């Protein structure tokens, strides 16, 4: 399930996250965790994303709905250590595709460290998928 809100709320949360990171605090629930998915829809229409996630020769499909001009964060998309090959497509378009690799490792304490997946839908429905490291 993706939490959806407005751009104004996203800017407010990003400001809080910046303040929290400067203060050394990571207790904010909307803070992206390693293995999470952040979707930002900068387009003026809602979209459905199809994610094909492959690891160790097994593939699973996830579907994410995101409203026009909204964003959503889903922690725990990648819950096991490993290298994930991810292909993202707009369900309503055959052409818009983005592919990237997400690395997640296990910490000595049993938690996860590594990257999260960020997907940006730009105006007119073009896609970007990038990874960002969170420890």
Residue positions per predicted region:
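Generic detection of short hydrophobic beta-strand segments and adjacent strand-loop junctions
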Residues: 62-66, 74-76, 98-108
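Surface-exposed, short loops/turns at beta-strand junctions within beta-sandwich domains
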Residues: 78-80
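A general structural signal for short secondary-structure boundary/capping elements
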Residues: 82-87, 96-99, 133-135
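Structured interaction patches on ligand/partner-binding surfaces of diverse proteins
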Residues: 91-125
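Extracellular ectodomain segments of secreted/surface proteins
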Residues: 25-36, 116-118, 123-135
């Amino acid at each position: 399930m993706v939490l959806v809100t407005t751009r104004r709320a996203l800017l407010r949360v990003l400001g809080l996250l910046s303040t929290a990171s400067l203060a050394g605090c990571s207790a904010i629930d909307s803070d992206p965790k390693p293995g999470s998915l952040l979707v930002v829809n900068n387009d003026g229409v809602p979209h459905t994303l199809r994610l094909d996630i492959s690891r160790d020769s097994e593939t699973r499909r996830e579907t994410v709905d995101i409203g026009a001009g909204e964003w959503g964060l889903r922690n725990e998309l990648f819950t096991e250590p490993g290298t994930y090959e991810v292909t993202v497509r707009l369900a309503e378009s055959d052409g818009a595709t983005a592919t990237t690799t997400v690395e997640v490792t296990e910490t000595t304490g049993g938690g996860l460290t590594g990257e999260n997946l960020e997907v940006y839908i730009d105006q007119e429905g073009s896609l970007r998928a990038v990874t960002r490291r969170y420890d």
